């Protein structure tokens, strides 16, 4: 049976880092929707948003999500993938959704530590910590609704991977 594990959460929560490590441990393929979008368009998220707006970007993001058809795979999604009810239903129906939860303070710390990795334009134009807190507050219910499992992403990536494995395979962890 084909198994997809969808990593959801805010920008900077570790979806790509944790997803890659989890895929290695499980022997699954790894896919990142932002990377797939870049490969299919030749444009960064910021470039797509500048040309097509957030609505155009979200439509492309949904197309990319539904194109993930490879066998067993861990899929790191964009932070806003859950804004679409269709995307939430698709992920829940096609696999297991893991929400990597972190506080606004932790996300801000990570994004400041690796500014070159943050290629997304601001959603609100506000200072980073304010924007993160506002976006988290607006999306929390949707992340929770999408998720089969919610994990604390403030731990080191290997610890988060271990926690995910314990949630997915509780009998193997005992």
UniProtKB/Swiss-Prot annotation:
Cofactor binding, note field: Binds 1 Mg(2+) ion per subunit.
Leading EC class: transferase
Residues reported in the UniProt entry to bind Mg(2+): 16, 32
BP GO terms, sorted: amino acid biosynthetic process; aromatic amino acid family biosynthetic process; chorismate biosynthetic process
Keyword Magnesium: yes
UniProt cofactor(s): Mg(2+)
Cellular compartments annotated: Cytoplasm
EC numbers: 2.7.1.71
Metabolic or biological pathway, per its Swiss-Prot or TrEMBL entry: Metabolic intermediate biosynthesis; chorismate biosynthesis; chorismate from D-erythrose 4-phosphate and phosphoenolpyruvate: step 5/7
InterPro entries assigned to the protein according to its UniProt record, in alphabetical order: P-loop_NTPase, Shikimate/glucono_kinase, Shikimate_kinase/TSH1, Shikimate_kinase_2, Shikimate_kinase_CS
GO cellular component: cytosol
Entry remark concerning the domains of this protein: The LID domain closes over the active site upon ATP binding.
Oligomeric form and interacting partners: Monomer.
Function, as annotated: Catalyzes the specific phosphorylation of the 3-hydroxyl group of shikimic acid using ATP as a cosubstrate.
Protein name according to UniProt: Shikimate kinase 2
Gene transcribed to yield this protein: aroL
């Amino acid at each position: 049976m084909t198994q997809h594990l969808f990593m959801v959460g805010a920008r900077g929560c570790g979806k790509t880092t944790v997803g890659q490590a989890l895929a290695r441990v499980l022997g699954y393929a790894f896919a990142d929707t932002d990377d797939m979008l870049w490969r299919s368009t030749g444009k960064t998220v910021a470039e797509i948003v500048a040309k097509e707006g957030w609505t155009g970007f979200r439509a492309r993001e949904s197309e990319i999500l539904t194109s993930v058809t490879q066998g067993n795979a861990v899929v790191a999604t964009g932070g806003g993938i859950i804004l679409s009810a269709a995307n939430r239903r698709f992920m829940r129906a096609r696999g297991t959704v893991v929400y990597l939860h972190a506080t606004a303070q932790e996300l801000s710390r990570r994004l400041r530590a690796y500014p070159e990795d943050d290629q997304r334009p601001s959603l609100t134009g506000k200072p980073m910590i304010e924007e993160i807190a506002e976006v988290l507050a607006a999306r929390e219910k949707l992340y929770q609704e999408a998720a089969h499992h919610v994990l604390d992403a403030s731990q080191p990536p290997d610890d988060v991977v271990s926690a995910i494995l314990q949630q997915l395979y509780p009998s193997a962890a005992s």
